[in-house]
């Protein structure tokens, strides 16, 4: 039809594999269809988008179940991302009234986190260029998990109890607050 209308043919056409409900193809006749509107009503559009990008690759069949959706949202969005945001805001407000300055009292663990944060956007973008959204999200969530681990390793709540460690505390909080304000974080979260 395009040729008959003298319209150029597409250079690239994206197709997708089957969307499965558990192990079976979704089918109205089987009664195992999960409707996107129902998912959005319950979980919200962003959580559903995240799930679809993470669990349903372009090059393989993707499976969706209510249990899998709840598990992914709880493990990644609530436990990893939500926990990190909550910890960051709570400690920044509690120890520095929400204004954290870099006192530059650095240790090796700080540089490791910074290096990971700087490398992550390039890795995530490369995965997106390969149409591997799930792998791009894995790169982002690896950084978020590492940041949660960084908080556990640096123990800001212990540093806060020692007035002589106040500058180190400020550096630690600054490092994980920086992830949300840097150009690198801005680019990666846009991915």
Task: Enumerate the language-model features and the residues they cover.
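Short acidic/His/Gly/Ser-rich catalytic and metal-binding motifs that mark active-site loops
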Residues: 22, 59-61, 81, 149-153, ...
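N-terminal low-complexity segments that are often proline-rich with Ser/Thr-Pro
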Residues: 189-191
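Conserved small/polar residues in nucleotide/adenosyl-binding loops
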Residues: 180-187
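Generic alpha-helical structural context detector
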Residues: 41, 49-53, 83-86, 90-93
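Secondary-structure capping and boundary motifs in well-ordered enzyme cores
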Residues: 28, 39-41, 69-80, 105, ...
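Alpha-helical recognition segments enriched in aromatics with Gly/Pro capping
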Residues: 1-67
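Short, charged/polar, low-complexity loop and linker segments
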Residues: 61-66, 119-126
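Conserved, charged catalytic cores of large soluble enzymes
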Residues: 85-124, 144, 148-165, 169
């Amino acid at each position: 039809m395009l040729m008959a209308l003298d319209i150029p043919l597409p250079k690239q056409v994206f197709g997708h594999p089957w969307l499965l409900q558990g192990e079976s193809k979704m089918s109205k006749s089987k009664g195992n269809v999960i409707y996107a509107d129902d998912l959005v009503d319950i979980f919200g559009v962003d959580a559903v988008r995240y799930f679809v990008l993470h669990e349903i690759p372009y090059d393989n069949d993707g499976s969706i179940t209510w249990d899998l959706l709840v598990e992914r949202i709880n493990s990644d969005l609530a436990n990893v991302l939500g926990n990190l945001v909550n910890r960051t805001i709570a400690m920044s407000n509690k120890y520095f009234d929400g204004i954290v300055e870099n006192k530059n009292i650095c240790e090796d663990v700080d540089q490791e986190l910074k290096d990971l944060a700087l490398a992550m956007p390039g890795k995530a973008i490369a995965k997106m260029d390969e149409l591997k959204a799930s792998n791009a999200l894995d790169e982002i969530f690896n950084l978020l998990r590492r940041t949660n681990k960084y908080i556990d390793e640096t123990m800001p709540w212990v540093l806060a109890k020692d007035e002589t460690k106040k500058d180190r505390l400020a550096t630690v909080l600054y490092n994980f607050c920086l992830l949300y304000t840097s150009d690198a974080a801005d680019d990666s979260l846009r991915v």
